[in-house]
C-alpha cells in the first residue's frame, strides 16, 4: 500500500484537494464553521493533508524538504522585479485597453483601493500556503517527470477545481467570478508560478508573485463587482497569453543558444 501511495503521491494529493474542499465549503454553508476558520482553514486543510501524506510516504525528511524552496533567496534581482510588477502591469494593460475600447480617459478606470492591515496579512498567509502546496510540492514534483510548463497547466486544472466550490459560495473570494474565466486565469497564474520557479527554484519569488496577484485583484477595478465580468475575463486572458509569450520566448532563447553551442562544437 505504501509503495502504491508513494508512486502516485502527487496525483493522489491533487485529486484529494478538490474532493476534500467540497465538504469543507458545505460545512461553512451549513454554519458548522465560522467565517474566520473557513477563510484560512481552506488553505490549512490542504497543507495538513499534504504533511500527513508526506509523513506516510517519506517521513519527517519529506516534510522538511517541502519547505526548502522558501530558503532559496539568492536569485537574480530581475526575478524579484518580475514577480513584483507582473500582476499589476497586466491589470494596467487591461484597464488601458478598456479605456481605449470605450473611448474614455484612462483615469476614468484606473484607481487603486486600499484595505486593512489585517486583510493584507491574510493575503500574504494565503499566498504562502498556496505557494507551499501548489508550487513547492505539486509543480516541483510533476516537473521531475514532465516539463515545468505542462506541470503548471496540470496543477491549474486541480487548483481551479479546488476553487469552484469557493466561487459558488462566494465567500473569501471575489464575488461573481465566471467559472470559465477562473479557469483561464488560473492557467495563467499556475503557468507564471511554474515559470518563476523553474528559473529560480525560489519559493520566496513565487510567494512575492502570488502576494502581488492577491493585492492586484483587490486594489485595481478588475473584479467582476467593481470592473465587470468582461474586465476580469480580459485580465485573465491577457495574463494567460502573456504567460504563454514568456514561455515561448524562453524556449526560443534556449533553443537558439543550444544551436549556437552545437555549431561551435562542430
State each model region's role:
Residues 18, 44, 84, 120, ...:
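Residue-level signature of the transmembrane alpha-helical core
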Residues 129-156, 198-202:
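Membrane-interface helix/loop boundary segments of multi-pass membrane proteins
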Residues 28, 133-142, 170, 208, ...:
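Active-site-flanking alpha-helical
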Residues 177-232:
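Functionally important transmembrane alpha-helices
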Residues 93, 138, 192-193:
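Hydrophobic/aromatic residues in alpha-helical transmembrane segments
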Residues 2-127, 198, 218-266:
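Specific transmembrane helices
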Residues 149-174:
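Membrane-helix boundary elements
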Residues 10-14, 79-80, 137, 151-152, ...:
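Alpha-helical transmembrane segments and their helix-entry boundary regions
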Amino acid at each position: 500500500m505504501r509503495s502504491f501511495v508513494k508512486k502516485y503521491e502527487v496525483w493522489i494529493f491533487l485529486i484529494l484537494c478538490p474532493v476534500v474542499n467540497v465538504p469543507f465549503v458545505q460545512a461553512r454553508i451549513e454554519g458548522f464553521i465560522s467565517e474566520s476558520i473557513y477563510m484560512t482553514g481552506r488553505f490549512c486543510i490542504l497543507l495538513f493533508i499534504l504533511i500527513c501524506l508526506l509523513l506516510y510516504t517519506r517521513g519527517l525528511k519529506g516534510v522538511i524538504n517541502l519547505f526548502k524552496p522558501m530558503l532559496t533567496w539568492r536569485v537574480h534581482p530581475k526575478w524579484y522585479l518580475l514577480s513584483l510588477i507582473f500582476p499589476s502591469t497586466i491589470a494596467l494593460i487591461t484597464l488601458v485597453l478598456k479605456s481605449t475600447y470605450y473611448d474614455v480617459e484612462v483615469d476614468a478606470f484606473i484607481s487603486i483601493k486600499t484595505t486593512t492591515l489585517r486583510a493584507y496579512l491574510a493575503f500574504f498567509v494565503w499566498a504562502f500556503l498556496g505557494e507551499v502546496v501548489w508550487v513547492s510540492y505539486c509543480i516541483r514534483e510533476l516537473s521531475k517527470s514532465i516539463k515545468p510548463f505542462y506541470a503548471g497547466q496540470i496543477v491549474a486544472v486541480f487548483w481551479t477545481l479546488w476553487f469552484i466550490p469557493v466561487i459558488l459560495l462566494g465567500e473569501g473570494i471575489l464575488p461573481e467570478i465566471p467559472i470559465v474565466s477562473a479557469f483561464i486565469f488560473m492557467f495563467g497564474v499556475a503557468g507564471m508560478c511554474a515559470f518563476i520557479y523553474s528559473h529560480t527554484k525560489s519559493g520566496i519569488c513565487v510567494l512575492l508573485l502570488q502576494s502581488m496577484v492577491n493585492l492586484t485583484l483587490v486594489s485595481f477595478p478588475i473584479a467582476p463587482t467593481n470592473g465587470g465580468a468582461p474586465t476580469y475575463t480580459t485580465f485573465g486572458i491577457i495574463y494567460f497569453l502573456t504567460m504563454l509569450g514568456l514561455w515561448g520566448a524562453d524556449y526560443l532563447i534556449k533553443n537558439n543558444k543550444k544551436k549556437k553551442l552545437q555549431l561551435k562544437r562542430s
